[in-house]
Amino acid sequence: MAKTAFIGLGVMGAPMAGHLAAAGHDVAVYNRSEDKSRDWAQRHKGRTYSSVANACEGADIVFSCVGNDRDVHEVFDAACKTMRKGAIFVDHTTASAALARELAEKAEACGLGFLDAPVSGGQAGAEAGKLTVMAGGEPSVFAEAEPIMRAYAANLTLIGPAGSGQLAKMVNQICIAGVLQGLAEGLHFATRAELDIEKVIAAISKGAAQSWQMENRWQTMVEG
């Protein structure tokens, strides 16, 4: 089993780290707000730390799932100082492709592997361990990290070199935006036509209009 660290215990990161622990990996966690770390430790087997550097010390593989480019940069800069040589840094944050390329170069200079690996599937996918991962990086690094990521991901694809994972996530978001726009217009039409929305969804969700967004978002969209 791998010695891992997971940085960022939000709605996605907490269950992802939990699946790593459940799979038997040695998991160290860090979160900026310590209450989330304590809550995670009460529910899972693992160790909590008060700094990124301490959590990542001697790790074989470090995962981050944080807020934005700046957060990723700060986490990487701290982690690379204490990770063992030859270890891998996997960034699950939805961030920029430019940052991914920059960190891949820095990782290589530090003797580390790097993957930009944004995810899709939402909180439900994270909790079920069924996320989709689109990765950018070296094939050898992906091959080493993939079995560990299987703890929380059902579908993993190496898209191409560093930055490719983030670009693929952009494609994913563009497609989702189109689906959401169509779903919003359809729900608006059904409301104006005074149809029973639940019956409409029950019918069309079994046909060609079915989508993950319809299944998981229609009710909150109707409620506003």
What are these regions (language model features)?
Residues 1-64, 87, 93, 123:
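NAD(P)+-binding Rossmann beta1-loop-alpha1 motif at the extreme N-terminus of oxidoreductases
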Residues 27, 48, 113-115, 156, ...:
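Hydrophobic beta-strand scaffold residues
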